[in-house]
């Protein structure tokens, strides 16, 4: 009887440790809104060029997207 109580206690303790490690602080990311660049001309090949144009338009970032490779500027909503 003592052995089974020790075993149950040990298993319960290990389960609690396992569950507690999965319950850390959760980070929440802001949604990202995208709009097509008004000043970018031509096919978007380089994300760096797109991002530079978007910075000039007042956006914090930008990248090339889609089949037609258009430049989209991004910001947090």
Swiss-Prot record:
Homology family: Belongs to the DEFL family.
UniProt name for this protein: Defensin-like protein 4
UniProt cross-references to SUPFAM superfamilies, sorted A to Z: Scorpion toxin-like
Keywords assigned by UniProt, alphabetized: Antimicrobial, Disulfide bond, Fungicide, Plant defense, Secreted, Signal
Signal peptide: 1-30
Listed InterPro entries: Defensin_plant (IPR008176), Scorpion_toxin-like (IPR003614), Scorpion_toxin-like_sf (IPR036574)
Record bears the keyword Transmembrane helix: no
UniProt xrefs under PROSITE patterns: GAMMA_THIONIN
Disulfide bridge partners, by residue number: 33-77, 44-64, 50-71, 54-73
Expression across tissues: Expressed in roots, siliques and seeds.
GO cellular component terms, semicolon-separated: extracellular region
Function in brief: Confers broad-spectrum resistance to pathogens.
Compartment(s) of residence: Secreted
Chief place of localization: secreted
An example Gene Ontology biological process: defense response to fungus
